[in-house]
Amino acid sequence: RIIEQGTKEGFAVAAIDAFYKKEVKPTDKTLFPNATEYANNLRKILEKDDRFDKNKIFYTGFSYGAEQVLKTIGAPFNSQNPKAWKAVVAAEPGCNSFHQPVKLNFSMLIIKGEESHYYIEPCKILEKEMLKKGNNINIIVLPKANHYFSTNGKIGKGIAVNGCRDNPIIKKSDGSLQMYDGSKISRKEARKKCLTS
């Protein structure tokens, strides 16, 4: 839908398939590729092409792709890529783990389904932390929509990163992890705590 509507509106839309030719199953959450890196490399290529306005490139992703979009809010990405995007949109992120926000040069929109099994609470916490840094962020909740609103709406079974609903994990700029309540946590403990089936 984004590709179709975007091109109708005159946008050039590049859809990245980070899973292309990778033997990764939806249950292999810890083996997923770094789609943010792919998107950022593509952005750098497009910026060199005179057909595109480098000041009007935005980044969006759905579900896992939305989690990849959330990587752009922290110091690790922003220190190396200032002013990378005009805006970012994360559609149905889990928000159970996110980088400690920094002041951004772009706006963010988060789209959530009201009935999603990736609950809204951690995204509200992320919004609060983003606002503390003076960022422009907005959350839109789609009534009666679940996580699969962009497809047929049929709920599947599998592993989800949704077990840190009220106390998400914050990735600090030094690479360490802590829970929202301030308690320290290891990567192994974080996976155990946040992954559910």
Tell where the protein language model's regions lie, with residue ranges.
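Alpha/beta-hydrolase active-site loop
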Residues: 28-50, 71
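Alpha/beta-hydrolase fold nucleophile elbow
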Residues: 51-63
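Short beta-strand/loop motif that positions the catalytic acidic residue
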Residues: 110-112, 142
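Short glycine-enriched nucleophile-adjacent loop
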Residues: 66-79
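Conserved alpha/beta-hydrolase "acid-adjacent" motif
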Residues: 117-125
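Conserved alpha/beta-hydrolase
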Residues: 6-24
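C-terminal catalytic histidine-bearing segment of alpha/beta-hydrolase fold enzymes
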Residues: 136-197
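A conserved short beta-strand
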Residues: 79-94
